[in-house]
Amino acid sequence: MIILITNDDGFESEGIKLLKEVARNFASEIWIVAPDTDRSGAARSLDHPVKQSIRINQHNEREFSVSGTPADCVIIALNKIMDKKPDLVLSGVNIGSNVGDDVCYSGTIGAVMEGAARSIPSIALSQAYHGGINWYNTKIFAPKVIAKLVKVGWPKNIAMSINFSATEKVKGVEFAEQGEYNIDGDLTFTENPDGSLSLNWSREHLGSGSVGKIKEGFITITPIKLDFTDYDTLNAMKNSYAEEFSSIVN
């Protein structure tokens, strides 16, 4: 199996080193193409349409850092660096969970969405933490969860997101929706000596889906769609308002 690894925490992060060790359990080839700096919060954004150039730095035969976003890294890996299409894209391991609205902001998730858009099975891995980061649960359980997912498979154009709890004891593995935060939460700004602002955003967990499950000690698996369309609302609006809106141009 040929595996492409990327992340949003950067080429030198501990999480990507751990993911390389995890991938060795089932990979014949491992390629790493990751941002050269921390690009957390990049979502599925791209640098390459707006930058005149992107740097690719080769560290060894199959390991590269890129001056772009996680999504850039996947695109560049598939179209420039790799000579074969990978069988699997792995992104992470992220420092912190990717649940609730984090899914919209996360570069870790953005990378696997880029892979899924090209019909490549793609999995994001994120480790929750309280205080200092502890990778133990990911180290022990990630190889087993990934192997099971690859065995059972899932539809094309769907990415998988695995979140590992920070609890000392793992209660089990559950399939769960992304869940919800209180989006406003406790938002505070602190002015720095240079006049810039530091932002601290502490959001309340509402307890649903993966947000609540990882707090309870579960590893969660969440399928993520590329298509953002709400089909229930779309069909309801077509049935109720199509004629009214068509009159705008008639």
UniProtKB/Swiss-Prot annotation:
Xref: SUPFAM superfamilies: SurE-like
Keywords: Cytoplasm, Hydrolase, Metal-binding, Nucleotide-binding
UniProt name for this protein: 5'-nucleotidase SurE
InterPro entries: SurE (IPR030048), SurE-like_Pase/nucleotidase (IPR002828), SurE-like_sf (IPR036523)
NCBIfam families: PRK00346.1-4, surE
Catalytic activity: a ribonucleoside 5'-phosphate + H2O = a ribonucleoside + phosphate
Cofactor: a divalent metal cation
Gene source species: Wolbachia sp. subsp. Brugia malayi (strain TRS)
UniProt enzyme class: hydrolase
Family: Belongs to the SurE nucleotidase family.
Cofactor: binding comment: Binds 1 divalent metal cation per subunit.
One cellular component term from this protein's GO annotations in UniProt: cytoplasm
Localisation: Cytoplasm
Highest taxon listed in the record's lineage: Bacteria
EC number, as in UniProt: 3.1.3.5
Physiological role: Nucleotidase that shows phosphatase activity on nucleoside 5'-monophosphates.
Any one GO molecular-function label of the UniProt entry: metal ion binding
